[in-house]
Amino acid sequence: MKKSLSILSILLGISASAQVNVAATAGTATATYTTVKGAFDAINAGTHQGVINITITANTNETATAALNRSTGNSSFTSVSLKPAAGVTATITNATTAGPVFRILGSNVTIDGSNNGTDSRNLSIVNGFATGSVVVTMGSSDAANPLSNVTLKNTTIINGVKTAGSGIIVSNTAGAQSAGYFNNIRLENNSIQRSYQGIYMIATSLVGNGAGSVITKNDISASGENSNRLMGIYLGGTDGVTVSANKIGNFDTANNESKRGIWLAVNTMNSTVSDNIIDNIGVNNLAGGSATGIQIFTNAGAGNVPSANKILRNKITNLFSSGLNSSVTGISLGGSTVGTVISQNTINNLLNTKGGSSTGLGAEGITLNTGTASNTLVSNNFISKVSSFGASFSGSTGGILINAGSGYKVYNNSVYLTETQNDGTSKGLPIALSITSVTATAAIDLRNNIFVTNLADSSVPAYATSIYFSTLFANTDPKVIFSNFDNNIFYSSSNLAILSVTTTPTVLTNITELQTTYGSNANSLRALPKFVSDTNLHITETSESLEIDNKGVALTEVPTDIDGTTRNETTPDIGADEFTVATMAVNDGANRSKIQVYPNPVNDVLTVSSDKKVSNISVYNVGGQLISEVNHSNVINLTKLSSGVYFVKTVVEGKVEMTKVIKK
């Protein structure tokens, strides 16, 4: 019996000692350890050198932070890699001491959680400590020796609590949320759970600091007990970081705080934030709280270099708040930020339900609130289903809200608002484009946009656009704030536009009044585009869209649309979608069905003959402009039309046919 127990003890000892295997090309070639800390300590002491590979064969319980120091002094390595053995799924846990599980201070390090060379996540790194925990930190406090070429990928990172701390911090040697020095850091395909902040990257503001770093394909959207709480990804002071294809959302909703999917903070520059999905972020706390998909508040970068951040092709959906003094914003641009591009983003389902007052609280798809000469381009964005109780012109429901500043180019955006909040006491004020407190001459260049507010609730006032000046700027002429203002489509189920500088605003009901009051817009239209749906703002490529086809002006800054489709070089479409109306529906007389249009050519009255009831006849010129229409009649008088070619659209029991007609 004693012999059996002795053998068992030996076997268990061998198993325990084989949890972490180390192989090196210099120094001690191979060794085994019970913890990653043991392996890192040996590397720091110079026991293993050269190219070092660490293989995890079973779970480990770390008793303190596993810190890998810089290769200097006794430590001498070319590179270090850590990964689970083939076929092994393992967990590395530290539940006994404060501090991170891993602290990476040495360059040329790769932690890959896949056990088969793919994107599978087979390694979990867990901090089970109860207070203020962090899972992985990395960085340098030495400007002459920045941390570089570190990759952390294919892992599951679980923090001990979500009341404080982060899943991953990239900063300085101490691993605190203080600025450090680093470049070429890659954080890829990690699942980050139960954190206060998912990824926190902060650099000392210096040209090139952070360059080449990539945060991509991470999942920060766990729900339930393992949900994250405050913020998905934070960048501060970095230069040249890419944040792409991350999934962020499902945050804890209980606390009164400002939640953000992605935050570009002070001195962040030359970043590209693209193709991220931000979904289901909000606050259910009556005391307050706000939700923002992407916030850019960077000011100028190092050496006053323009921040030049790009926000591209992100999908931001289902943001909400129900609290006092709360706000909901898809993309928020503020500070003295310069050179930002916000393009090809899709923003929908933003909801602020705090009501019960005369003004309510707002929600906006995109908010622009920078300083002067911001050189900001906002183009090719879809914004829809934004709703709130905001009822003042400075705090309404806005598709795009330009709140202050200048240097804005707002081109080819599509905004479609269809909902508002109305509890019988408070009502929202939906405005597709809202301009407030902008007074600088030629501050805004506004062309090729679609601004539509189309509500089913007729008791709620709604506007396609508004301009608001506080009493301090009551004498400002709205015409002076635009450098260009034309080739836009406006539509509202209530009034088209409003100018508010006093307690009695000026309501504008048609394009002529808008042209007179706002200025320009000679080529703008009042029309209701036929979108695919309330949240899919692609234009239906049918004859119903002829009226708005090819009505834009060519702009060099917008060569493609929201999908990357090349735009017409001379007469592009208005809005974010470049579309082509199908021409095969045109009936030139050779392929007539049971619908007959005659006489053709016509002098005066045109008749539509059909065995079904005709619900609509519309006449368009060759440019697609609606000239005349009648409903529930099979004749239309064309006497006053000039001679030429026209297209007649007939609608019979929902079926549409286009016929080319010659007017004598």
Features from the language model and the residues they span:
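C-terminal outer-membrane/trafficking sorting elements
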Residues: 587-664
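Acidic glycine-/aspartate-rich tracts in secreted/extracellular proteins
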Residues: 46-47, 58-63, 85-89, 115-118, ...
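Bacterial Sec-dependent N-terminal signal peptides
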Residues: 1-21, 583-586, 600, 654, ...
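C-terminal accessory segments
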Residues: 479, 489, 512-578
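Short glycine/acidic-rich loop motifs that flank beta-strands on beta-rich extracellular proteins
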Residues: 65, 96-99, 127-135, 157-168, ...
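Extracellular beta-strand-rich solenoid/capping regions of secreted or surface-exposed proteins
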Residues: 63-81, 89-112, 126-148, 162-177, ...
